[in-house]
Amino acid sequence: MTRAAHSTEPEDLPEAIVIPPASSTPVRAVLLDADGVLQLIGTPWGEALTRGGGPAFAQAMIDGETDALAGRETLTELLERVVKDLGLELRASDLLEMWHRATPDPLAWQLVRDLREAGYTTVLATNQQWERRAWMREQLGYDGLCDIDGYSCTLGVAKPDAAYFQRLLELAGVEADQALFVDDSATNIAAAREVGLRTIHHPADAGGELLRREVAQALTLAASPSRG
């Protein structure tokens, strides 16, 4: 696969924020969101959609995205339908470029590698349409980063549906309380907690240095006998 010129090797790793070994905690799997966590997106989605097609377009895309995220239709099909319904003089192929934006965070990717080295099963837990999944794999180089790829379009269900989390737990071979889920969406975090997962609500685009501290702290707390 062809990769774009995005370096995923950190130039300067923050010193000595140690990841506890998996053997020292009850956590066996770490599930990480992509947008806002492993990759930086800059302009929030709602704002970007509004800029690209107007407020009505943005709302229609948000309201109608479920089937595309669950892989039951393509993003192109959704865009074509919304453009037609709203009578917009825009081309779906041009609008599709809005989904071709994200910059991998080298420090976040290094955290994934360190988690794997420490014995955790790492899971890419991300809502994506078929087209953006292909772009992330081919241009950003996501294949092989995590042990398990949990793209919603391939699973047939998307966050915040409980079935999405249950499917990832099955793939990872762990119980809910053995999994730590990191996401920038409060809705997704609440849904994961309902299923019983441990969670970290990471601020969108806050960067890999903070992410590393959050994950290390959560794993250390999980290892404490006084937890809960």
Feature names for model-found ranges:
Residues 72-76:
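A structural motif shared across PLP-dependent enzymes of the aminotransferase-like
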Residues 2-32, 129-228:
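Asp-based, Mg2+/Mn2+-dependent phosphohydrolase catalytic module
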Residues 88-89, 222:
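Membrane-interface interhelical linkers
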Residues 40, 124-126, 201:
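Hydrophobic residues in well-ordered beta-strands that form the structural core
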Residues 93-123, 162:
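Short, acidic loop-to-helix structural element flanking the phosphoryl-transfer center
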Residues 46, 108-113, 189, 212:
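Short amphipathic alpha-helical segments and helix-helix/interface helices
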Residues 3-66, 70, 81, 85-88, ...:
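Active-site neighborhood of HAD-like aspartate-dependent phosphohydrolases
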